[in-house]
Regions:
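N-terminal catalytic or cofactor-binding beta/alpha core of small enzyme domains
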Residues: 1-174
Length: 174
């Protein structure tokens, strides 16, 4: 298993994401962004999905602020996506909890996301590969009510991931 840790503030963060993702991206790739806008800490995925859609990203993107994929609908939405794209390679994107020193890191991994794991939920794995953004500490008393997560952090990390995916697609075309 390969995992790369990238600080979102690095000027080359988008490039590091792109270099990793380019080896997995193809015309048969689908982007699945997990989370909800009902919680600042959980909106990283839907923000990435929204930014990709707004930029006319050429690959299918699921999970946006308007139409999120979250704990209550993930089973149905993933089944729908797999029916529409039966042979697709999926890149899963989600927010994650981690150590305090890891907040602000973006991890690119050659294995799926385990959504809900950090908050004790058992949901289906998503993705052939995954990109997670660590937005808060797992030491926080309650992820869903934590007031320490800044929307600015989530927005900036979402922009970096979006830029990385866009650049990865450009590298794939070259």
């Amino acid at each position: 298993m390969v995992k790369q840790k990238i600080n979102y503030k690095s000027s080359l963060a988008y490039y590091d994401i792109a270099i990793f993702v380019k080896d997995y991206i193809s015309e048969n790739t689908v982007i699945v962004c997990i989370g909800t806008d009902k919680c600042i800490g959980d909106c990283l995925g839907p923000l990435v999905g929204t930014f990709l859609k707004e930029s006319s990203f050429p690959l299918p993107v699921y999970g946006t602020i308007e139409s999120p994929i979250h704990a209550l609908n993930i089973d149905n939405r993933i089944n729908e996506i797999k029916k529409i794209h039966p042979n697709a390679s999926i890149i899963g994107i989600d927010a994650c909890l981690g150590d305090t020193k890891s907040i602000g890191e973006i991890h690119t991994r050659d294995y799926p996301i385990h959504p809900g794991k950090g908050v004790g939920k058992s949901l289906p794995d998503v993705g052939t590969i995954s990109i997670i953004g660590i937005i808060d500490s797992s030491d926080s008393y309650d992820f869903f009510t934590s007031r320490s997560i800044r929307l600015y952090l989530v927005m900036e990390m979402s922009k970096v991931i979006t830029h990385g995916l866009t650049h990865a697609y450009d590298l794939f075309l070259d």
